[in-house]
């Protein structure tokens, strides 16, 4: 006996909606991990809950590298498709604004992580990278203190 198809509409019951979100998010993250392993693909996934909580997965050690690569790729694609120079210039400024805004948001997120905030939304791999970065910074600070 198989499951029936679920009608694609918003789930009205708040508790059922949250349970469904959690289960489907976990399934989506698992699928992203599986495709990265099985197909040796570079996979990144970003999910925001209805409350704005961030959930992410990256097969690379650093989501920032993947996002920068995506920005470069999409920028190059748009350059090839924009024939009008005026429109092209406007698009360049718009894209640059979007790119810088995303970079600022990323830096703010990283700063919160360095301060120990919003750590529940990041993966174990990212926590290990954060720990390594903080250890490196502490070593650098201690070595500078010894020199003075």
Curated annotation (Swiss-Prot):
Q: Which Gene Ontology terms of cellular component type are present?
A: nucleus
- Write down the superkingdom of origin: Eukaryota
Please state every residue range assigned to the domain named K-box. Answer: 90-148
Q: Name one Pfam family in it.
A: SRF-TF
Query: Which key words are in the record?
Result: Activator, Coiled coil, Developmental protein, Differentiation, DNA-binding, Flowering, Nucleus, Transcription, Transcription regulation
Ranges for the MADS-box domain? Answer: 1-61
InterPro entries (UniProt xref): MADS-box/MEF2_TF (IPR050142), MEF2-like_N (IPR033896), TF_Kbox (IPR002487), TF_MADSbox (IPR002100), TF_MADSbox_sf (IPR036879)
Q: Disulfide pairs?
A: none
Q: Where in the cell is it found?
A: Nucleus
Query: Can you provide one Gene Ontology molecular function annotated for this UniProt record?
Result: RNA polymerase II transcription regulatory region sequence-specific DNA binding
Tell me yes or no: is Magnesium among this UniProt entry's keywords.
Answer: no
An example GO BP is: cell differentiation
Additional free-text comment from the UniProt record: This is a truncated version of CAULIFLOWER that may contribute to the 'cauliflower'-shaped floral meristem (curd). This trait has likely been selected by early farmers during the domestication of modified inflorescence structures.
- Cited function: Probable transcription factor that promotes early floral meristem identity in synergy with APETALA1, FRUITFULL and LEAFY. Is required subsequently for the transition of an inflorescence meristem into a floral meristem. Seems to be partially redundant to the function of APETALA1.
Q: How does it assemble?
A: Homodimer capable of binding to CArG-box sequences.
Protein's name in the database = Truncated transcription factor CAULIFLOWER D
What species was this sequence derived from? Brassica oleracea var. botrytis (Cauliflower)
